[in-house]
Amino acid sequence: MAENASDATTAATNLRLSQAVWETVANDGIEATTVRRVAERAECTTGLLMHHFGTRTAMLAHAREVLYKRTAARANNAENLGLNPRETLFEVLSGTLTLDTERQQEARVWMGFAAAALPDSDIRKLHVSGNRDWLQRITRLVAACELAASPYAAQGFAVRLIALTEGLATLSSLDPETYSADIQRSMLTAEIDSLLGAQHS
């Protein structure tokens, strides 16, 4: 019983620290995500935080991993809805649009890491790896729509769609009135329809 209680306490602490890192990055930005600020949010000592993560870079990398997992889980759920290939492609891609508060927060984290990745090679490697995994997923979904005659062409379509959705997520984070949820959905629908039409014309 004592061991189970200890495990539960450890799990609760890990979750609290993870949430504190995520919320600090999302609300305050990468540059402001210091060990002290995260510790204050987690209501713990800086020593406990550093014992858990080791370094500030590792702490930031954890937040990026959380973003990967959240995005992947949403995409997996979309793929398991039993929709047709085109609808599945739309649902997965719309998971990265800022259609609700949760995804708005994720977009802010993504932008923060994109900026931090420029001068930091470790963060850049992690960021690029995650983005390439996403490109592989979207390329596979595009191919399932029979949009392309070759893997190269399928990837080209995927790059266009990702550029659109990531661009919309960024712009809407800065100007949500102009780039509303309805506008984002409409533009993604139009781009997918354009690709389908171009392939079958």
Explain the meaning of each model-derived region.
Residues A12-R16, A20-A58, H62:
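Helix-turn-helix
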Residues T13, R56, A63, L67, ...:
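Hydrophobic/aromatic residues within well-ordered alpha-helical segments
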Residues R16, A20-N27, R74, V109, ...:
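Solvent-exposed, amphipathic alpha-helical segments
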Residues M1-A12, E23, Q199-S201:
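N-terminal intrinsically disordered/low-complexity leader segments
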Residues E65, A73-E106, A154-L161:
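Hydrophobic alpha-helical connector segments
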Residues T88, T101-R124, S173:
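Amphipathic alpha-helical segments used for helix-helix packing
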Residues D122-V128, R132, A144-S201:
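Hydrophobic/aromatic-rich alpha-helical bundle segments in the mid-to-C-terminal region
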